[in-house]
Amino acid sequence: MRRPSLTRLRRRLPRLGAKLQLGQGLKRAKRLLLNQRGDGVHSPFAFGLIHRVIRNRRPYYCFAPLREELRTSARSLSQEALRSPTALELIYRLLQELRPSEVAYRAAAVSMLPHYLEQSGLPCLRLEPQTQELAPRSCLILESWPTEGAELDELTHQLQELCRQSPELMLFVHLSRPRLGRQLEQLRAELQPQLVLDLLDLQLWFFDPSLTPSRYKAVY
């Protein structure tokens, strides 16, 4: 069996990339139609969050300079860093809406996330990976997280302890690559959040026992 030549592979790459973009676009369009009127969303909290925050792209004054800074520094960002201004702005809007008392986050080595969190006006603590344990917080953001081996097991154990100590925890997890979905599903199964909002590249997990147990797919 002949192997495809390097030239043929190079010719196929743009077409493969276009197919992936088309697939993502169709997935987003399907979710948009389902979320248009809140179809299937039975949790009042989730319905309000989807329509007031996730689907609302209301601009803030701080967004314009942050977008420009993101554009100029895009090439220097770490591979697992959030690169979409829409995603970073959504995290900012979520914090403005939910107003958690304490925010902790684990960011990529070179990231724009700290700049957006700084503008939120909330007390935010950056946690250094592998050196700082997860103390009780009301909100935790994981832009960068270990995806295999002992490091993932340790993170899972720390998050389980955190959920016990902070029963109303909000956890935002960044899915930097689609192939990490299996690890994320494993983590979700271990932690069993009360409410899950799946936004493709972002997962919002809420552990408040007063919320309606549910899982929804949405777009922003």
PLM regions and their residue ranges:
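Short glycine-centered segments of the SAM/dcSAM-binding site in methyltransferase folds
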Residues: E168-L171
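Walker B catalytic acidic pair
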Residues: V173-L175
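A short alpha-helical cap/connector motif
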Residues: M1-C139, W145-S166, R177-Y220
